[in-house]
């Protein structure tokens, strides 16, 4: 689960990390009012969306007076911000954050992520932060500092101090940097975060360290013990397809293709998507119906997939162990008759009760394309999609 920049900064500020003074705004009038509250002569207006690279996409504006603030707010609110991280759909800007401009002397980068392979927290830092950090990582990988933290003992202050020295900071900033890095780790740990990124962490001309931007993601499996974090969720920033599926207990990830996928098991789902691409198609989603799939659960899956208007074909691929193919087949027929499946449908059933499942499909009289193997299922799905697209274009 992601949260907004201003929410992440509130969490950081509670732990002693310095952030610019700022305020939330939902209208141009509120934005100009916030400027008067904050004071000063320059402000930065930021679109609050769950994405990085906002500056390059026009989501961050430096303003010097009320007119510039109002104009920038008017241009941002209500439109979708498209960045390299949002995909072509973009994300709606419904709130803005106005904060005081900061006189920057140097931009740094500090990030905290889970290294799942090593089962440790990895701290990544660079003396060159800002909008070009991705290019720096690619072109100058040796300039990136990496420190791993043993979860058994947690981060030690000497590690934070080593990072501060590694960033090449002036000696009078080492103490401040050590405390800032250590406090960021505490926020990461105490709220069950999966990612915390400060980019940039700036050195100001008067010798302070300020978190100028902040991104945080959280482990959804830990939200039951973090109700204060759950309350920060903004569903308007999430893929509505994923929200619909999540509310119904389905594991769903939206993609940008045209072939909807209903599959059991993450491994089979990924293999199926690979086969669809090899056959020349593009998957519209990842949907794992899980074990014990009842007819009702299968029907819910169809509703989730068909909620994406880009879906022009559906592929159901089931390898039943815990599941039963006859139950899945009943769910497919239930979905066709109750949900209304108006796109080509390819079904491959294998494993427990597979013969019974195929018989149910055959006896139903519904237009279901049956496949025996994974490769055949992917090829038939792509062929059906192409035929449907050709018919639609005619």
UniProtKB/Swiss-Prot annotation:
Its EC number is 6.2.1.9. Its cofactor is Mg(2+). Pfam families: ATP-grasp_2 (PF08442), Ligase_CoA (PF00549). GO terms for cellular component: cytosol; succinate-CoA ligase complex. Mg(2+) binds at residues 199, 213. SUPFAM superfamilies: Glutathione synthetase ATP-binding domain-like, Succinyl-CoA synthetase domains. It comes from the Bacteria. Residues 9-244 form the ATP-grasp domain. Keywords: ATP-binding, Ligase, Magnesium, Metal-binding, Nucleotide-binding, Tricarboxylic acid cycle. ATP binds at residues 46, 99, 102, 107. Binds 1 Mg(2+) ion per subunit. GO terms for molecular function: ATP binding; magnesium ion binding; malate-CoA ligase activity; succinate-CoA ligase (ADP-forming) activity. GO terms for biological process: succinyl-CoA metabolic process; tricarboxylic acid cycle. It catalyses: (S)-malate + ATP + CoA = (S)-malyl-CoA + ADP + phosphate. InterPro entries: ATP-grasp_succ-CoA_synth-type (IPR013650), ATP_grasp_subdomain_1 (IPR013815), Succ-CoA_synthase_bsu_CS (IPR017866), SUCC_ACL_C (IPR005811), Succ_CoA_ligase-like_bsu (IPR005809), Succinyl-CoA_synth-like (IPR016102). The keyword Magnesium applies. The keyword Ubl conjugation does not apply. Pathway: One-carbon metabolism; formaldehyde assimilation via serine pathway. Heterotetramer of two alpha and two beta subunits. Belongs to the succinate/malate CoA ligase beta subunit family. This is Probable malate--CoA ligase subunit beta.
């Amino acid at each position: 689960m992601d949260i907004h920049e201003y929410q992440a900064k509130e969490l950081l500020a509670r732990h002693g990390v310095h952030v610019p003074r700022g305020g939330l705004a939902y209208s141009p009038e509120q934005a100009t009012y916030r400027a008067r509250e904050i004071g000063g002569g320059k402000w930065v207006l930021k679109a609050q969306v769950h994405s990085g690279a906002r500056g390059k996409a026009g989501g961050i504006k430096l303003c010097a007076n009320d007119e510039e603030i109002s104009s920038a707010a008017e241009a941002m609110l209500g439109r979708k911000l498209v960045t390299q991280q949002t995909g072509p759909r973009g994300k709606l800007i419904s709130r803005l954050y106005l904060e005081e401009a900061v006189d920057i002397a140097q931009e740094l980068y500090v990030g905290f992520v889970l290294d799942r392979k090593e089962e440790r927290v990895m701290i990544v830092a660079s003396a060159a932060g800002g909008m070009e950090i991705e290019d720096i990582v690619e072109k100058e990988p040796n300039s990136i500092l990496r420190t791993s933290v043993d979860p058994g003992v947690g981060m030690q202050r000497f590690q934070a101090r080593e990072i501060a020295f590694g960033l090449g900071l002036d000696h009078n900033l080492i103490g401040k940097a050590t405390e800032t890095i250590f406090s960021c780790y505490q926020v990461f740990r105490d709220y069950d975060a999966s990612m915390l990124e400060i980019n940039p962490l700036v050195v100001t001309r008067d010798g302070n360290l300020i978190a100028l931007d902040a991104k945080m993601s959280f482990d959804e499996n830990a939200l039951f013990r973090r109700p204060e974090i759950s309350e920060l969720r903004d569903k308007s920033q999430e893929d509505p397809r994923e929200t619909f599926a999540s509310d119904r207990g389905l594991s769903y990830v939206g993609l940008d293709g045209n072939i909807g996928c209903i599959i059991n098991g993450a491994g089979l789902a990924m293999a199926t998507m690979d086969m669809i691409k090899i056959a020349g198609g593009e998957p519209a989603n990842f949907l794992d119906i899980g074990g014990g799939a009842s007819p009702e659960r299968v029907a819910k899956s169809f509703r989730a997939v068909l909620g994406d208007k880009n879906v022009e074909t559906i592929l159901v691929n089931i390898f039943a162990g815990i599941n039963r193919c006859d139950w899945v087949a009943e769910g497919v027929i239930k979905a066709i008759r109750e949900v209304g499946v108006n796109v080509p449908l390819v079904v491959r059933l294998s494993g427990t009760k597979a013969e019974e499942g195929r018989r149910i499909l055959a006896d139903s009289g519904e237009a279901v394309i049956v496949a025996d193997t994974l490769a055949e299922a992917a090829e038939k799905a792509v062929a059906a999609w192409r035929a449907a697209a050709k018919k639609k274009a005619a």
